[in-house]
Amino acid sequence: MNRPERLQPGVKLRDADKVSRIPVKIVPSERETMLRKPDWLRVKLPASNQRILEIKQALRSNGLHSVCEEASCPNLAECFNHGTATFMILGAICTRRCPFCDVAHGRPLKPDAEEPVKLAQTIRDMKLKYVVITSVDRDDLRDGGAQHFADCIREIRKLNPEIKIEILVPDFRGRIDAALDILSTEPPDVFNHNLETAPMHYRKARPGANYQWSLDLLKRFKERHPNVPTKSGLMMGLGETNEEIAQVLRDLREHKVEMLTLGQYLQPSKFHLPVERYVSPAEFDELKVLADELGFTHAACGPLVRSSYHADLQAQGKEVK
């Protein structure tokens, strides 16, 4: 029996190569079977792309990554023009193979020890007031990357003392308490971890993750830092029902999560999970009403909402759709 070829560090696997070994196999979508994208998902492009080019240049010159680009976010133009970006630390190669996500899989390189300082300097140069810091999954690291998050928060605050920092973290599988011990040295202003979908769809959409682990991570952070808001995000269109999503919202509130983002899943390529339905704006509005009734302090629900979409406005309590 031939052994699978060992991945070389730094090599990005995408599309069919990325999802070749997940438990629920992906059958590449044929154009004629793909659902037609409705009009409410049309993204209006800005009149000028100057600000977009400036932000991309700032990222390139410092060897930094944005999840906006790596995950092919549909809101990239709007957010970059708004002067916001979600920085992705610890490289652009993930140790997981989630088939909804467009971030590459592979064996990551060692963390860049200079990245926290580069990130802080870039944020200062961009004159940002609110930043979101996220990362790929780093199951290869003993702490899951928690120390690197803490280092980034510390360096950012050194150069940007008035800034607000939201972190969007992986699940720190098998090392939650150790990771939270480290993050307690430099707690963020908002702690975000995405559940992504309802638990019965985890095997298909989040191989290697566990619904209860993710809930426990959010709850345990809140127990340690009761004054720091906790936040989570979900996608719709992966085969879930509205009632399944409603139950996830109840579970989040039972685990003391206060902020919510709920948006439409969009298929990055034919090798990713197909969109099983497009959820109407009216349905998102109904789930927004439920979220408010359940006691979420902030709930952004709409087709183009993403976890860090206008995160600065949401943190200020402003309406985001």
From Swiss-Prot:
Binding site for [4Fe-4S] cluster 1: 68, 73, 79, 308
Keyword set, alphabetical order: 4Fe-4S, Cytoplasm, Iron, Iron-sulfur, Metal-binding, S-adenosyl-L-methionine, Transferase
Domain of life: Bacteria
Cofactor note: Binds 2 [4Fe-4S] clusters per subunit. One cluster is coordinated with 3 cysteines and an exchangeable S-adenosyl-L-methionine.
One GO cellular component term: cytoplasm
PROSITE patterns xref list: RADICAL_SAM (PS51918)
Subcellular location: Cytoplasm
Reaction catalyzed: [[Fe-S] cluster scaffold protein carrying a second [4Fe-4S](2+) cluster] + N(6)-octanoyl-L-lysyl-[protein] + 2 oxidized [2Fe-2S]-[ferredoxin] + 2 S-adenosyl-L-methionine + 4 H(+) = [[Fe-S] cluster scaffold protein] + N(6)-[(R)-dihydrolipoyl]-L-lysyl-[protein] + 4 Fe(3+) + 2 hydrogen sulfide + 2 5'-deoxyadenosine + 2 L-methionine + 2 reduced [2Fe-2S]-[ferredoxin]
Cofactor: [4Fe-4S] cluster
Enzyme class (EC, first level): transferase
EC number in record: 2.8.1.8
Binding positions for [4Fe-4S] cluster 2 per the UniProt entry: 94, 98, 101
Pathway(s) it belongs to: Protein modification; protein lipoylation via endogenous pathway; protein N(6)-(lipoyl)lysine from octanoyl-[acyl-carrier-protein]: step 2/2
Pfam families for the chain: Radical_SAM (PF04055)
Radical SAM core domain residues: 80-297
Chief location bin: cytoplasm
One MF annotation (Gene Ontology) recorded for this entry: metal ion binding
Listed PANTHER family: LIPOYL SYNTHASE (PTHR10949), LIPOYL SYNTHASE, MITOCHONDRIAL (PTHR10949:SF0)
Family that this chain belongs to: Belongs to the radical SAM superfamily. Lipoyl synthase family.
Name of the protein in its database record: Lipoyl synthase
Organism: Shewanella sp. (strain ANA-3)
Phylogenetic lineage: Bacteria, Pseudomonadati, Pseudomonadota, Gammaproteobacteria, Alteromonadales
Gene behind the chain: lipA
